[in-house]
Protein backbone atom coordinates (compact mmCIF):
# COMPACT_ATOMS: atom_id res chain seq x y z
CA UNK A 1 0.00 0.00 0.00
CA UNK A 2 2.86 2.38 0.86
CA UNK A 3 4.51 1.59 -2.47
CA UNK A 4 1.29 2.43 -4.30
CA UNK A 5 0.97 5.75 -2.42
CA UNK A 6 4.55 6.74 -3.22
CA UNK A 7 4.00 5.77 -6.86
CA UNK A 8 0.85 7.91 -6.95
CA UNK A 9 2.69 10.84 -5.37
CA UNK A 10 5.51 10.48 -7.89
CA UNK A 11 3.04 10.39 -10.79
CA UNK A 12 1.23 13.47 -9.46
CA UNK A 13 4.52 15.33 -9.05
CA UNK A 14 5.60 14.40 -12.58
CA UNK A 15 2.30 15.49 -14.13
CA UNK A 16 2.24 18.78 -12.25
CA UNK A 17 5.83 19.45 -13.31
CA UNK A 18 5.01 18.80 -16.94
CA UNK A 19 1.93 21.00 -16.88
CA UNK A 20 3.76 23.96 -15.36
CA UNK A 21 6.83 23.72 -17.56
CA UNK A 22 5.37 22.96 -20.95
CA UNK A 23 6.14 25.77 -23.35
CA UNK A 24 3.34 26.67 -25.70
CA UNK A 25 4.23 28.32 -28.98
CA UNK A 26 2.94 31.81 -29.78
CA UNK A 27 0.56 31.72 -32.72
CA UNK A 28 0.33 34.75 -35.03
CA UNK A 29 2.34 37.17 -32.88
CA UNK A 30 1.30 40.83 -33.00
CA UNK A 31 4.04 43.22 -31.93
CA UNK A 32 4.33 46.91 -31.24
CA UNK A 33 8.04 47.76 -31.29
CA UNK A 34 9.91 50.85 -30.16
CA UNK A 35 13.66 51.39 -30.03
CA UNK A 36 16.41 53.77 -28.99
CA UNK A 37 19.99 54.09 -30.20
CA UNK A 38 22.80 56.32 -28.97
CA UNK A 39 23.25 59.35 -31.19
CA UNK A 40 26.02 61.25 -29.36
CA UNK A 41 29.48 59.66 -29.29
CA UNK A 42 31.04 62.60 -27.44
CA UNK A 43 29.55 61.74 -24.04
CA UNK A 44 29.41 57.93 -24.31
CA UNK A 45 31.98 55.20 -24.78
CA UNK A 46 29.76 52.79 -26.74
CA UNK A 47 26.68 52.91 -28.94
CA UNK A 48 23.71 51.42 -27.10
CA UNK A 49 20.70 49.80 -28.77
CA UNK A 50 17.48 49.22 -26.82
CA UNK A 51 14.45 47.49 -28.35
CA UNK A 52 11.17 47.29 -26.46
CA UNK A 53 8.22 45.31 -27.75
CA UNK A 54 4.67 44.69 -26.73
CA UNK A 55 3.70 41.15 -27.76
CA UNK A 56 0.28 39.54 -27.99
CA UNK A 57 -0.38 36.06 -29.34
CA UNK A 58 -3.57 34.80 -30.95
CA UNK A 59 -3.63 31.85 -28.53
CA UNK A 60 -3.02 34.22 -25.56
CA UNK A 61 0.32 32.77 -24.51
CA UNK A 62 1.94 35.00 -21.88
CA UNK A 63 5.35 35.32 -20.25
CA UNK A 64 7.25 33.49 -22.96
CA UNK A 65 11.00 33.14 -22.82
CA UNK A 66 12.38 35.03 -25.82
CA UNK A 67 15.86 35.38 -27.29
CA UNK A 68 17.17 37.91 -29.79
CA UNK A 69 19.73 37.48 -32.55
CA UNK A 70 21.52 40.50 -34.00
CA UNK A 71 24.12 39.84 -36.69
CA UNK A 72 24.86 36.37 -35.34
CA UNK A 73 25.08 37.37 -31.67
CA UNK A 74 22.39 36.18 -29.29
CA UNK A 75 21.01 38.11 -26.34
CA UNK A 76 18.44 37.18 -23.71
CA UNK A 77 15.21 39.16 -23.81
CA UNK A 78 13.93 40.40 -20.45
CA UNK A 79 10.27 40.46 -19.53
CA UNK A 80 8.79 43.70 -18.28
CA UNK A 81 6.50 44.09 -15.31
CA UNK A 82 3.51 44.48 -17.59
CA UNK A 83 2.20 41.35 -19.30
CA UNK A 84 3.45 41.06 -22.86
CA UNK A 85 6.23 43.67 -22.52
CA UNK A 86 9.79 42.65 -23.41
CA UNK A 87 13.13 44.42 -23.82
CA UNK A 88 16.51 43.55 -25.27
CA UNK A 89 19.61 45.73 -25.30
CA UNK A 90 23.18 45.48 -26.53
CA UNK A 91 26.10 47.79 -27.16
CA UNK A 92 28.85 48.13 -29.75
CA UNK A 93 31.97 50.22 -29.98
CA UNK A 94 31.34 53.41 -31.93
CA UNK A 95 33.63 52.21 -34.73
CA UNK A 96 31.60 49.00 -35.12
CA UNK A 97 28.17 50.63 -34.89
CA UNK A 98 27.68 51.70 -38.48
CA UNK A 99 24.69 53.75 -39.56
CA UNK A 100 21.95 51.67 -41.14
CA UNK A 101 19.28 49.11 -40.37
CA UNK A 102 19.86 46.34 -37.85
CA UNK A 103 17.59 43.30 -38.10
CA UNK A 104 16.72 41.93 -34.66
CA UNK A 105 15.35 38.41 -34.97
CA UNK A 106 13.33 37.13 -32.01
CA UNK A 107 13.09 33.43 -31.17
CA UNK A 108 11.04 31.40 -28.72
CA UNK A 109 12.68 28.58 -26.75
CA UNK A 110 12.13 25.92 -29.39
CA UNK A 111 13.45 27.90 -32.35
CA UNK A 112 16.31 29.27 -30.23
CA UNK A 113 17.46 25.74 -29.40
CA UNK A 114 17.37 24.94 -33.14
CA UNK A 115 19.42 28.08 -33.81
CA UNK A 116 22.05 27.16 -31.21
CA UNK A 117 22.22 23.59 -32.52
CA UNK A 118 22.75 24.85 -36.07
CA UNK A 119 25.52 27.17 -34.85
CA UNK A 120 27.27 24.36 -33.00
CA UNK A 121 27.14 22.17 -36.12
CA UNK A 122 28.26 25.04 -38.42
CA UNK A 123 25.00 24.81 -40.37
CA UNK A 124 23.13 27.61 -42.15
CA UNK A 125 21.21 29.52 -39.47
CA UNK A 126 19.27 31.65 -41.96
CA UNK A 127 16.88 28.76 -42.65
CA UNK A 128 15.59 28.84 -39.06
CA UNK A 129 12.56 31.13 -39.07
CA UNK A 130 12.31 33.62 -36.21
CA UNK A 131 9.08 34.20 -34.33
CA UNK A 132 9.21 37.80 -35.61
CA UNK A 133 11.75 40.42 -36.68
CA UNK A 134 12.17 44.07 -35.69
CA UNK A 135 14.13 46.52 -37.87
CA UNK A 136 16.14 49.10 -35.94
CA UNK A 137 17.25 52.17 -37.90
CA UNK A 138 20.46 53.64 -36.50
CA UNK A 139 21.44 57.02 -37.93
CA UNK A 140 24.99 56.84 -36.67
CA UNK A 141 26.66 58.76 -33.88
CA UNK A 142 27.75 62.37 -33.74
CA UNK A 143 31.42 62.68 -32.82
CA UNK A 144 31.38 66.37 -32.04
CA UNK A 145 32.40 69.39 -34.10
CA UNK A 146 35.37 69.19 -36.44
CA UNK A 147 37.09 71.92 -34.44
CA UNK A 148 36.80 71.92 -30.68
CA UNK A 149 35.34 75.02 -29.04
CA UNK A 150 38.58 75.67 -27.16
CA UNK A 151 40.59 75.91 -30.39
CA UNK A 152 37.92 78.11 -31.98
CA UNK A 153 37.87 80.47 -28.96
CA UNK A 154 41.68 80.72 -29.00
CA UNK A 155 41.69 81.49 -32.75
CA UNK A 156 39.03 84.19 -32.34
CA UNK A 157 41.01 85.69 -29.44
CA UNK A 158 44.18 85.81 -31.52
CA UNK A 159 42.32 87.48 -34.44
CA UNK A 160 40.79 90.10 -32.09
CA UNK A 161 44.20 90.76 -30.49
CA UNK A 162 45.79 91.16 -33.94
CA UNK A 163 43.05 93.56 -35.10
CA UNK A 164 43.30 95.62 -31.89
CA UNK A 165 47.11 95.73 -32.05
CA UNK A 166 47.10 96.76 -35.74
CA UNK A 167 44.46 99.43 -35.11
CA UNK A 168 46.54 100.79 -32.21
CA UNK A 169 49.69 100.79 -34.36
CA UNK A 170 47.84 102.54 -37.20
CA UNK A 171 46.48 105.23 -34.85
CA UNK A 172 49.88 105.88 -33.26
CA UNK A 173 51.62 106.15 -36.62
Swiss-Prot record:
Q: Which regions of this chain are Cytoplasmic-facing, per the record's topological domains?
A: 166-173
List all disulphide bridges recorded for this chain: 26-57
Q: Name one Pfam family in it.
A: TRAP-delta
| Residue spans, topological domain Lumenal | 24-144
Entry membrane topology: Single-pass type I membrane protein
| Source organism of the structure | Rattus norvegicus (Rat)
Record keywords, A-Z: Disulfide bond, Endoplasmic reticulum, Isopeptide bond, Membrane, Signal, Transmembrane, Transmembrane helix, Ubl conjugation
Q: How does it assemble?
A: Heterotetramer of TRAP-alpha, TRAP-beta, TRAP-delta and TRAP-gamma.
Q: Which domain of life is it from?
A: Eukaryota
What does the record give as the function of this protein? TRAP proteins are part of a complex whose function is to bind calcium to the ER membrane and thereby regulate the retention of ER resident proteins.
Q: Name one GO cellular component term.
A: endomembrane system
Provide the protein's localization.
Answer: Endoplasmic reticulum membrane
- Signal peptide residues on this chain, from the entry's feature table: 1-23
Q: Does the keyword Signal apply?
A: yes
Q: Where is this cross-link: Glycyl lysine isopeptide (Lys-Gly) (interchain with G-Cter in ubiquitin)?
A: 73
Q: Which residues cross the membrane?
A: 145-165
Protein name as it appears in the record: Translocon-associated protein subunit delta
Chief localisation class: endoplasmic reticulum
What InterPro entries does the record tag this protein with? TRAP-delta
Family membership, please give it. Belongs to the TRAP-delta family.
Amino acid sequence: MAAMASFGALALLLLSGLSCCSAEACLEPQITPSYYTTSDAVISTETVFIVEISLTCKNRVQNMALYADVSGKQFPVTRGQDVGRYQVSWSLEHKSAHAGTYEVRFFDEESYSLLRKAQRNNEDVSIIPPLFTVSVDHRGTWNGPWVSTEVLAAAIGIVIYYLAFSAKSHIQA
